[in-house]
Amino acid sequence: MSSSTATPLDNPPVLKLLNVESAYGPIKAIRGVSLQVRKGEIATVLGSNGAGKTTILKTISGILDPRKGSVAFKGLDITAKDPAFIVQQGLLHVPEGREVFPLLSVRDNLLMGAYTRRDRDGVARDMEMVYAYFPILKERSHQDAGLLSGGQQQMLAISRALMANPDLILLDEPSLG
């Protein structure tokens, strides 16, 4: 008898945190955080302001080094690795606050997201995909990103991450705009 249901062995975690603790100076921001995310899953971290959601994402993406515990991505230990190394592995972090390059055009912001890619055809295809998802970005492609509305800047920040063709995107406060 065969089963079409995937087991955890068939779909190992893409992201795994085990007993992670991080702090800002002497103040523990998170402790004992463990989670797993498998390919195809959408995971959400919920909590009130100050609960540590942003700290978890910063720890995963290498912006903040954990004091304890481990972080693995695609089976590779990325605990306390350089953020650039983590990006090269295919893990992108879109921070809260609509982080765009305000003096660059919308198009150039998108191309900045693809800076690690070498497949020009794929970059062009993904640019068209982004424009299909967010037509306003195509309309404003030659406008400086700093002139976009808050919501449009958030669209651009998420789209820039998509341009890297990542395996996993961490979105911090994606509806803030």
List the predicted regions and their residue ranges:
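Helix-to-loop junction immediately C-terminal to a conserved catalytic motif
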Residues: 61
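Conserved catalytic motifs of ABC-family nucleotide-binding domains
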Residues: 165
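ABC-type ATPase nucleotide-binding domains, specifically the catalytic core motifs of the NBD
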Residues: 25, 43, 81, 106-125, ...
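ABC ATPase C-loop
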Residues: 161-162
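Conserved ABC ATPase signature
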Residues: 144-148
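Conserved ABC transporter NBD signature motif
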Residues: 69-76, 89, 123-127
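The feature captures the beta-strand-to-loop junction immediately N-terminal to the Walker
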Residues: 46-48
